[in-house]
Amino acid sequence: MRFSGKRELIKSVQRELGILADGLDGPVTWKTIYDQVKGESEKPSSSSIAEDMVNLAKSEIGVSEIDGTNCGPRVDEYKAATWLDPDKGWPWCAAFICWLVREAIENKDVDFKRPQTAGAWDFENWARKQEGKGVALYKPVGEILNRQDNDRPYIRKGDIVVFRFSHIGLAIGEPMSNGHVATIEGNTNGAGSREGGSVLEKSRRVSSIRSVIRIS
C-alpha cells in the first residue's frame, strides 16, 4: 500500500524499534514488530492479592503439624508471620492467614499494615484499623449472604472468612446453592475441627461465618 509520507513513517517506527531506518517495510522490520508484540502478550498479567492468596493456599494443602504439637517445619513458618513465638505450640489457623497475606503482598505496593495476630476473631480488629486502605470488613454477616445486585457486598473468592466458632479460613469460591462455601483453612482436619493440625480444603455452612474481610 502506498500513501504520502509512508517511508518517513516507516523510518520513525524503525527508529523506535532500534533497527536500520531505511524506510522499507521488509521482513526484518515485520519480524521485529512481531517479536515485540509477541513478547508483550506473553508477559504475565499482574494478579490481585486475593488471587495470589488463593493460589498460595492451594499450594499448601496437606501441610501438617507434628504429632498434635501445633509445631512443624512449615507450620512454624506460618506462625512466624505473627507476633507470637513460632517455636511454641499454639493454635495456628490465624497464623496461616497472616502468612498468606504476607506472601501475597510481597513486592506489591499496599497502604495497609499486614495482620500479625494469632487470634481468629482479632482479625476483625485488624480489619477495622485498616479500613479505607484496601481492607474492608463486612459484619454482621447477614449483610453479605444474599447477593441481589452488583453493588451488594458478597462472599467472593479470596475473601477471609471469620467463623463463629473462633476459627478462620480463606474462601476459594462464592457460596454454593447448598448454602456452603469452599474454603482452605489451617489447623483443621477431616471433621472440620478448629484445632485439627493440617491445611485442608473444607466446605463450610455460610451460616457459620460471623464476618468477611476483603483485601483489594
What is the predicted role of each segment?
Residues 1-45:
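Short acidic, glycine/serine/threonine-rich helix-capping segments at coil-helix boundaries
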Residues 3-8, 24-27, 47-51, 87-95, ...:
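Soluble non-cytosolic domains of exported or imported proteins
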Residues 38-111:
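N-terminal capping segments
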Residues 69, 73-88, 162-206:
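Glycine-rich catalytic cores of cysteine/serine-nucleophile enzymes that process amide/ester linkages
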Residues 107-192:
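...with weaker cross-activation on analogous glycine-rich loops/strands in unrelated enzymes
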Residues 26, 56-58, 98, 158-163:
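Short, functionally critical alpha-helical segments immediately adjacent to catalytic or ligand/cofactor-binding
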